[in-house]
Amino acid sequence: MLFTLPGQRLEAAAELVRPGAYVADIGTDHAYLPIYLVGRGIASRAVASDINRGPLERAASNIRAAGLSDRISLLLTDGVDGLFGLGVTDYLI
C-alpha cells in the first residue's frame, strides 16, 4: 500500500528525515508519519508514541493495515518517557 501524508506539516517533517533513520513520532495520533516514512523506505524503523490509548489503538490498526508491525513499535507514554531505552537515536518528531 502506497501511503500519502495528509497535510503540508507532515510532508515538511518527512522531507527532513535522512534515509535509513530510526524515528520516533511523539504524539503520533494515527501514525501517519511513521507509516509514510517506513513504508516508503525512508526510515528503517520507527516508534509511534502517544499519551492516550485511543489514538494509539488507531495507530496500531493503521500500522497493521500497512503491514508494518514488524518495523513500527507502539509506546503509550507521556512525551519521551521510556523512549530512549528503545534505541531511537536519529529523529524525534
Region annotations inferred by a language model:
Residues V88-I93:
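A short SAM/SAH-binding and catalytic strip from SAM-dependent methyltransferases
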Residues T4-G20:
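Conserved alpha-helix/loop element of class I SAM-dependent methyltransferases that forms part
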Residues N52-R53:
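Conserved SAM/SAH-binding beta-strand->alpha-helix loop
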